[in-house]
């Protein structure tokens, strides 16, 4: 179902200079300072209840942080194109509002959480998962299973706090490919055009949040059913073992896509645009096009971790571009 015109997009992705670093204005500590300088107040509910067949599901926000939008989330295009994309979506052109949204699934005796937020790794706007779970009436100790899409810091940073597990009764599931990459003696992040201190924070997040839970980790291979009703789908490229999850109950389903795409104005509408955090940009692009084609053609309900809250919707195709139809808010 891959659409025509992708060769030109692949060429654009392939020309990305992986050896170059982002401008010094995007150094990690300055990103955090940028976040702190912005107004980051919560105005609305941080959780959203819905159903997938017999499954009681809840999207829970971990919070948000702010980044300069270019080139971090559109490395291989121009600042002018990014401004045009943001303006076409009626969005500010001087900042990118990155949201993190976890998914809780009540499946009988199984209480499943997909990803855990950023914890303390991305400044004060993030790391609110536990607080927001309590507002939704969900106890961390009730979580029996945690599914990790990939081991980037904004997905695993909420596993531990001050050396103690925040989900004391949970078993973790991580793809075998992903865990093998991050457990290597020398973790190779050279393909990511970000400053070295940012790479160090990625490695530290894995060391602080995954390694202490080693005796609770189970690995899986792609296409396996992790728990009844949830299947692991290979969507590698953004990370070496990036996993999406098919969630099925009766005739209903939801595809959790993790970080295949990040924002309607960027790598959804322009799937060839790579982020600085794509570890294999050409492969990430191929995966993105494959999943976007499938989701739009089959009209599959989707949850995407970084999409604007509640991060639920449908993908529709517009030639070589795609759009996002957000799920209607249900009171």
Label the model's feature ranges.
Residues 24-59:
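C-terminal segment of N-terminal export signals and the immediately downstream linker at the start
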Residues 46-136, 244-259:
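Conserved beta-strand hairpin/beta-sheet module of binuclear metal-dependent hydrolase folds
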Residues 54, 105, 115, 143, ...:
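Divalent metal-coordination and catalytic microenvironments
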Residues 250-331:
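Cap/insert and terminal regions of metallo-dependent hydrolase folds
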Residues 124-173:
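Active-site metal-binding motif and surrounding structural segment of the metallo-beta-lactamase
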Residues 2, 8-31:
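N-terminal export signals
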Residues 62, 116-119, 151, 177-178, ...:
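Active-site metal-binding loops of divalent metal-dependent hydrolases
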Residues 127, 134-138, 142, 176-234, ...:
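Metallo-beta-lactamase
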């Amino acid at each position: 179902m891959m659409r025509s015109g992708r060769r030109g997009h692949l060429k654009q992705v392939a020309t990305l200079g992986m050896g170059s670093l982002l401008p010094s204005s995007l150094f990690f500590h300055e990103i955090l300072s940028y976040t702190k300088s912005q107004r980051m107040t919560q105005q609305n509910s941080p959780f959203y209840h819905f159903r997938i067949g017999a499954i009681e599901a809840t999207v829970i926000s971990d919070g948000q942080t702010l980044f300069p939008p270019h080139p971090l989330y559109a490395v291989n295009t121009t600042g002018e194109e990014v401004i045009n994309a943001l303006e076409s979506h009626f969005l500010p052109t001087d900042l990118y509002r990155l949201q993190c949204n976890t998914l809780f699934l009540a499946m009988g005796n199984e209480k499943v959480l997909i990803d855990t937020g950023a914890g303390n790794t991305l400044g004060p706007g993030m790391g609110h998962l536990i607080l927001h779970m309590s507002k939704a009436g969900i106890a961390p100790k009730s979580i029996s299973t945690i599914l990790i899409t990939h081991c980037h810091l904004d997905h695993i940073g909420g596993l531990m706090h001050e050396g103690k597990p925040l989900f004391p009764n949970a078993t973790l599931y991580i793809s075998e490919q992903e865990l093998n990459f991050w457990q290597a003696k020398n973790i190779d992040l050279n393909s990511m055009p970000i400053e070295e201190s940012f790479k160090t924070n990625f490695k530290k997040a894995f060391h602080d949040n995954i390694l202490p839970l080693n005796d609770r980790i189970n690995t899986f291979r792609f296409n396996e059913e992790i728990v009844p009703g949830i299947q692991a789908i290979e969507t590698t490229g953004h990370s070496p073992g990036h996993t999406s999850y098919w969630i099925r109950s009766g005739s209903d389903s939801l595809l959790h896509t993790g970080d295949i795409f990040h924002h309607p104005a960027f790598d959804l509408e322009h799937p060839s645009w790579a982020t600085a955090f794509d570890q294999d940009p050409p492969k990430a692009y191929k995966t993105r096009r494959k999943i976007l084609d499938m989701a739009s053609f089959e009209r599959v309900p989707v949850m995407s971790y970084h999409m604007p809250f509640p991060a639920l919707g449908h993908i529709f195709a517009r030639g070589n571009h795609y759009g996002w139809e957000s799920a209607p808010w249900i009171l």
